[in-house]
């Protein structure tokens, strides 16, 4: 009985420590937990389809709205997707305290390389929500500068307001000196935001990097978003030289919990028109 209990405890300990996990993609903080969703009855050996890399917001996860709904709806349209937890988030390796936008861009670029390596992928699109929108926009710009632009880009309530928050010394309930923040602050009283994040976010060239991407763009923003102001999406529209489209979803909030189906529909229909 004691031996059996010991074996169970040992297994649980190794599982919690992450030794039982296997990662296919790695970012600067380590292995990235990811999930590929394919269209129904899709044969990876003989079929081809486009794929969209889905990026969640700060403190969020690949398993939190709106990411799972996006993946499911894309699959119904014959489009595959990759969703993943950024380094330091949930099931990925790393520590939230050491997360930065720059590191998340590296995570996204690693996912891009993985998507390119999949033999069944025809085209690649990017989608980001909140801070994930900032990451997606800058990743698209970096890729465009390299000569390998994504085929389409969707930004849902892109959270470029993070830069103003860090410069202003207030971030999700945490207050700090922008010029000399502590080692970390606690957002919502529990989530650690590191000094490196606060300082580096102030120096980001968000729009300058994003504008290198000249492919098709759709922005989606809820009219009742109390976290990321509409002006962030409007600034992205002004930044892009191409015809970037902004769709305002009446009554929707930042977390996409009121009009989820409508938001998903706007995103998926855009990808269907651009990738297939």
PLM features per residue range, with description:
Residues 19-45:
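N-terminal cap/lid segment of alpha/beta-hydrolase-fold proteins
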Residues 71-93:
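Conserved alpha/beta-hydrolase
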Residues 213, 219-221, 225:
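Short beta-strand/loop motif that positions the catalytic acidic residue
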Residues 145-195:
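Hydrolase active-site cap/lid region
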Residues 224-228, 255:
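Acidic catalytic loop of the alpha/beta-hydrolase fold
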Residues 59-71:
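The serine-hydrolase catalytic nucleophile loop
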Residues 252-263:
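Catalytic histidine-centered segment of alpha/beta-hydrolase-like enzymes
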Residues 62-63, 89-119:
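Catalytic nucleophile-loop/oxyanion-hole region of alpha/beta-hydrolase
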